[in-house]
Amino acid sequence: MNPFWSMSTNAGRKRSDGEEQSGSGEQRASPARPPFGKKQLPSIPKNAVPITKAASPASSTQSANGTHASYGPFYLEYSLLAEFTLVIKQKLPGIYVQPSYRSALMWFGVIFIRHGLYQDGVFKFTVYIPDNYPDGDCPKVVFDTPVFHPLVDPVSGELDVRRAFTKWRRNHNHIWQVLMYARTIFYKINTMEPLNPEAAVLYDKDIQLFKSKVVDSVKLCNSHLFDQPKIDDPYAISFSPWNPAVHEEAKEKMFAHKRRPEDFNKGLPVSGLSWVKPGSTQPFSKEDNPLQT
């Protein structure tokens, strides 16, 4: 028998026996005891005020994204790592991104526009990810130099991302989609509910003046291309003028990485079309090899 339970029970019995006699020595009938083996809760006193128990400290450790605070940072880091892996696999055309060295919630990027109204534009930007990702709002995209565009704030340079992602849904929306949207706006102009009303009005009513301002905006952004990054970070994207001593070797390695003709017979995956001769862009330039008997 548990000694603590035995001691508590005996003490209760002694109090009950002592309470049966009043101060004047009068005998008082003891209350009926419940049958053996049953437990009975005491009655609730009248006008009793309920006492609210303080919340347990463990209940406050639940983070905003539904994960326990003890492993919440690891969950966030894993989510961002998975997102960056998706960006790499998508091979977004003309878009390059690099996570910050100081914070995984900040990514540096640049967009190259090959054709259209914003042709030859090189736009550097920064992606800001909420700290409760992926359960928070959609990431923000802010251009280093505000671009003249209906969906870009002319002062802050922030892109209207909420237009495409009104409500961020985890496991459905991804950061690579935000990056692709940031590229698409330069090819498909939308003037509904603009952040830059001037750009929207000119695009709808004076396209020539709009094009002129776009050309000036592209030149302005390109003129700041070699400036030092606005954020002091070792992984911030920076550009430098062409230096043959540095860049020529890298260029040669890029162009030298070509498949040799003998590699095509080794069962390796072949890129391109089978009727094009390796190293040539001439259609049907590949000679047919006669079958050996």
Swiss-Prot record:
Instruction: Detail the disulphide connectivity of this chain as listed in its UniProt entry.
Output: none
Entry superkingdom? Eukaryota
Q: Which residue intervals are annotated with compositional bias (Polar residues) in the record?
A: 1-11
Q: Which GO terms describe its molecular function?
A: ubiquitin conjugating enzyme activity
**Keywords linked to the UniProt accession:** Apoptosis, Cell membrane, Cytoplasm, Membrane, Protein transport, Transport
- Keyword field contains Signal: no
- From the UniProt record, give one GO term of the biological process aspect: apoptotic process
User: Could you give one GO CC term from the UniProt record?
Assistant: FHF complex
Q: What does the record say about its membrane topology? A: Peripheral membrane protein
Say yes or no: keyword Protein transport present: yes
Q: Residue ranges of region Disordered? A: 1-44, 260-293
* Limits of the UBC core domain: 75-223
InterPro entries in UniProt: Ub_conjugating_enzyme, UBQ-conjugat_E2_core, UBQ-conjugating_enzyme/RWD
Where does it localize? Answer: Cytoplasm; Cell membrane
Which protein family is named in the record?
Answer: Belongs to the ubiquitin-conjugating enzyme family. FTS subfamily.
Described function? May function to promote vesicle trafficking and/or fusion. May also regulate apoptosis.
Q: Which named protein is this?
A: AKT-interacting protein
Origin species, per record, is: Danio rerio (Zebrafish)
Output the lineage of the source organism: Eukaryota, Metazoa, Chordata, Craniata, Vertebrata
Gene name of this polypeptide: aktip
